[in-house]
Amino acid sequence: MIEIKNVSKLYGSKKALDNVSFTVNKGEIFAFIGHNGAGKTTLIKSICGILDFDEGEILIDGKSIKDEPIACKKIMAYVSDDPELYENMKAISFINFVCDMYDVPTEVRERNIKKYAEMFGIENELGSTIKTFSHGMKQKVALIAALSHEPKVLIMDEPFVGLDPKAIFDMKEVMKNTVKNGGTIFFSTHILDMAEKLCDRVAIVKKGQIIKVGDMKKIRGDKSLEKVFLELEAK
């Protein structure tokens, strides 16, 4: 579903991404982990078509994000760790604005907005202006907007930052149901025990290079993901 082939990205003389290659398969939850500055956000924004890259190719469901960006983005949703929302809009207006861009039918959007707003406990706040919300509330609005158009590919950068424990639990259930229904999830996180329990596969990035990628159970062996990660980082 997501194919990353020999992708490199330069910032001046520094390689933020260095010949990165791996595949995220349809119907799996894939974790992308690494220290701050390792290249996680750079790759995520490149996959989403937000950031250009210098070498290589990224395919979404067989289509190039460079050559067919609209076709790719139609089946994707992206949630950042610090969502940039239209602060002066009401939450419901922003969510409907996103649904309009994806041509979501009225019946589908109403059902999904109600479902996720109730799940995240903000159904009574949808009429409020976004600028009055806390970071966690804004994160919930971004998640509802992303989920309401039922994307085939959900890409998230630190999606659990700012969420309360119930919202984290609910989000994990959403992720499981999404892949059960044929969707694909690719996300970065620093919460390694959660990635260990939730994900099918994982890639570990260090200084812009992939140092380990594969099945979560095989990479872990009889160790915790945290221990494996720290051992690889120490090399």
Which residues fall in each region the model found?
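A short, proline-enriched helix->beta-strand linker immediately N-terminal to the Walker B motif
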Residues: 148-152
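Conserved ABC ATPase signature
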Residues: 129-136
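Conserved ABC transporter NBD signature motif
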Residues: 56-67, 71-72
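Conserved ABC ATPase "signature" region
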Residues: 96, 100, 107-125
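Walker A (P-loop) phosphate-binding loop of ABC-type ATPase nucleotide-binding domains
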Residues: 35-39
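Catalytic Walker B motif of ABC-type/P-loop ATPase nucleotide-binding domains
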Residues: 154-158
